Amino acid sequence: MAMQLEICANSAASCRQAELGGATRVELCAGIPEGGTTPSAGEMAVARSLIAIPIHVIIRPRAGDFVYSSEEIEAMCYDIRVVRSLGMEGVVFGCLTPEGGYDEEANSRLLKEAQGMQLTFHRAFDVCAAPFEMLEKLIAAGFHRVLTSGCAPTALEGKDMIGALNKQATGRIGIMAGCGIRLGNIETLARHTGITQFHSSLRHDIPSSMRFRRPEVSMGGTVKIDEYSRPETSADMVRQAVDILQGI
């Protein structure tokens, strides 16, 4: 199977850079420092107008755990309807029980809303209690792929688990490695695990055009983020990653 590179895009501009670099598809997210949250309808619409490659949108109403209230599930269902109406090809979500298991009721509601779309179970998988059992549940539910770091802080650290999951999957579901994937380790991961799907942001920082600055003021309060630069996917880095994967 051909190698696939999914770019975690934080904006419509990053989506355009991903396509220019030759990415297979993008996952469009807001709130990347929080692990990704659902982007605005405006961001989705602009992204869709800019690129032709598939766009998968994360359906995650907030940061934190993956146990959701009935109100949050209702909002997620609504977001899936918006994503579909804007012509996106797929959605990315995952709901867990308080015990770290597969939340049958919550996931079933979202799956029903997303019927006919591409379905990715996101890194909620990495904090589940029993990953091999969870994988079988995802296969039975009809997910097309699972995004995972191998239940480790980074995909490189979880490469043995990723390889084991890939062997268990036997082609029934795609195993897509994500978290900390860089130009310097993507080939190692591919050769060690045997997987063919990779997820990376491949971003660089673009300096702010602001000339007047108050660097001591942070919009995140006590959370210090550089307010005078913004990360954006680099088409050149994407192209390099694609070349590496095609050479394997």
From Swiss-Prot:
It comes from the Bacteria. Keywords: Cytoplasm. GO terms for cellular component: cytoplasm. It is found in: Cytoplasm. GO terms for molecular function: copper ion binding. Belongs to the CutC family. PANTHER family: COPPER HOMEOSTASIS PROTEIN CUTC (PTHR12598), COPPER HOMEOSTASIS PROTEIN CUTC HOMOLOG (PTHR12598:SF0). This is PF03932 family protein CutC. It comes from Porphyromonas gingivalis (strain ATCC BAA-308 / W83). The lineage of its organism: Bacteria, Pseudomonadati, Bacteroidota, Bacteroidia, Bacteroidales. The gene is cutC.
